[in-house]
Amino acid sequence: MAKQLVFDEHARRSLERGVNAVANAVKVTLGPRGRNVVIEKKFGSPTITKDGVTVAKEVELEDKLENIGAQLLKEIASKTNDITGDGTTTATVLGQAIVKEGLRNVAAGANPLALKRGIEKAVAAATEEIKKLAVPVEDSNAIKKVAGISANDAQVGEEIANAMDKVGKEGVITIEESKSFDTEVDVVEGMQFDKGYISPYFITNPDKMEAVLEDAYILINEKKISALKDLLPVLEKVAQTSRPLLIIAEDVEGEALATLIVNKLRGTLNIAAVKAPGFGDRRKEMLRDIAAVTGGQVVSEDLGHRLENVTLDMLGRAKRIRITKDETTIIDGMGNQAEIDARVNAIKAELETTDSDYAREKLQERLAKLAGGVAVIRVGAATETELKEKKHRYEDALSTARSAVEEGIVAGGGTTLLRVIPAVKQLAESLEGDEATGARILVRALEEPARQIAANAGDEGSVIVNAVLNSDKPRYGYNAATGEFVDDMVAAGIVDPAKVTRTALQNAASIGGLILTTEAIVSDKPEKEKAPAAAGAPDMGGMDF
C-alpha cells in the first residue's frame, strides 16, 4: 500500500487534532461532578462509564494522521492504568496541556529538543516534591477514602477497606460478578489451592461433600505415589499417633490409592489424598510454600529424601484441613513464622524482576496465600449494564487502594499538582533559554486538572486555581462535590495515591515530549473509493442480455 509523508507544522498540528479529540471526550469525566460517557457497542447494550481509559480506548478517528495523535494520547491513559489502575483522566488532561502549550512555542520558533529537556527536568523536580508531600497510609480509614474517591462511591471504598482489613495489605482481593442484586465480601481463611480429593471415598461429610481433617499431619511429596511399600512406613507411624493424614503428591494411584481407601473405609486411619497444585517449577515452589506454612518438608529426590525414610518430624501440621471436589484449604498451619517471612521476601524479590504479567499474577497469588488470605468481592446489580459499570469501578478502586498503600496519599482534587508549582518555577529560574520555557510549559499544564475539575462542577477554573495558589495553607484546596474551599484536603478525605499522581505526570510528559519533537509522519494513504459499476441502458430496463 502506498504511504503518505507529512512534515513539520502540518504533521504536529494533525497529531494535536487527534490528541484533542481523545482528551475532550475523556476530560468531561474528571472529578466528583464529572459527566458520564455513553459508548456504543456492536453487540449488546451500550456501556455507560466515567472511566477515562475506557473512553480513550474506544476512540478511533477517520483521518489517519489525526488517529496517530489519538493513539499516542491513548498510550498515556493505558500506561497509567496498567501501573496504577487510576489517574488516567488526569494523565490525559496533563498530556493535552503539555502538547497545546509546547506546540505553541515550537510554532513560535523554540527548539523542540530543548523544550523536551526542560519538561523532563521539571517533571523530575515535581515528582520529588510529590514524594515529600505524601502521607503514609496507616489505617483502613485512609484506604476507605481513597478507594471511595476513585469509584465515586463511599460504599465501594468501605467494602475495599473491609476486604483489605480481613486479608491484610499483601492479601489477594478478587472482584467477581454476583448472581444476586447485593454486593458481598467473602474471605477464604488459610492457604487454599485449586486441587480437590483424588477419590470421593475420602469424604467425611456427605451432606456438604467435603473431607474435614482436624489436627492433621501433612505429607508433601513431589513425585507420584503408586507403590504401597514406599508409603507403608509413614502410614504406620501416623497410625500410632491416631491423627488424620493428608497426602499431597503429583498423583496417588494403583495399590497405594487402593490401600488408602480400604484403610479409610475400615476406620483404621482418617486419611485423604490430593494432587499437588501447579505444574513444573511452579509446582515445586508451591509445595515449598505449603511446607513453610505447615512446618513440614518437601519429600524430594533432588534433596536426597526417599518416601520410605520419612519421619514424623518431616510432616507438616495444621489444626484444620477442608477438602472439596475442587479445592483444598489448610487452616492454621503450624509453620515457623521466620520461614514464612523468608518465603514472602523471596517472592517479593522475584516480583521486582519479572516482566511477565502472568508470572506476576501467579507470584501475587502465592504471596497472598502466605501473607494473609484471599477475599472475594461479589458485585451485584439490577441490570447487566449497571453490573459491568459497577464491577469496573470496584476494580479501579482496588488498584487505587493498592497504590495508596505503596507510596502513601496526597491531597486530591488537583491540589497536589498546584502545590508542586513553586518548586518547578524555582527550577525554571535556574535554567536558560528554551529549557526554561519547557519548565514553564509544565507549570501551566500542572494547573489544568484543577481547572477541569472545577469546570466539570460548573465553576470558573481560573478563580479556583488562583485561590488555591494564593493560600499559604499547604493542603488548602477546593471540594468540587460541595462547591466549598477546604483548609485541609487530606483531613477532609479528599485524597489521591501519590503513586497515581506521580505516574500520571511522568507518562503525560513522556508522550507529550515525543509529540513536540515529531518532525514527520509516515502513514498509509487513504484508499480512493471505487466508482460504482455503470447501470444498464435505459431502453433495456437496466439489464444486460
Swiss-Prot record:
InterPro entries: Cpn60/GroEL (IPR001844), Cpn60/GroEL/TCP-1 (IPR002423), GroEL-like_apical_dom_sf (IPR027409), GROEL-like_equatorial_sf (IPR027413), TCP-1-like_intermed_sf (IPR027410). Signal peptide: none annotated. GO terms for cellular component: cytoplasm. It is found in: Cytoplasm. Its main location: cytoplasm. Its EC number is 5.6.1.7. ATP binds at residues 29-32, 50, 86-90, 413, 479-481, 496. Residues 532-545 have a biased composition (Low complexity). CDD domains: GroEL. It is an enzyme of class 5 (isomerase). It comes from the Bacteria. Keywords: ATP-binding, Chaperone, Cytoplasm, Isomerase, Nucleotide-binding. Residues 525-545 are annotated as: Disordered. PANTHER family: 60 KDA HEAT SHOCK PROTEIN, MITOCHONDRIAL. Belongs to the chaperonin (HSP60) family. HAMAP family: CH60. NCBIfam families: GroEL, PRK00013.1, PRK12849.1, PRK12850.1, PRK12851.1. This is Chaperonin GroEL. It comes from Deinococcus geothermalis (strain DSM 11300 / CIP 105573 / AG-3a).
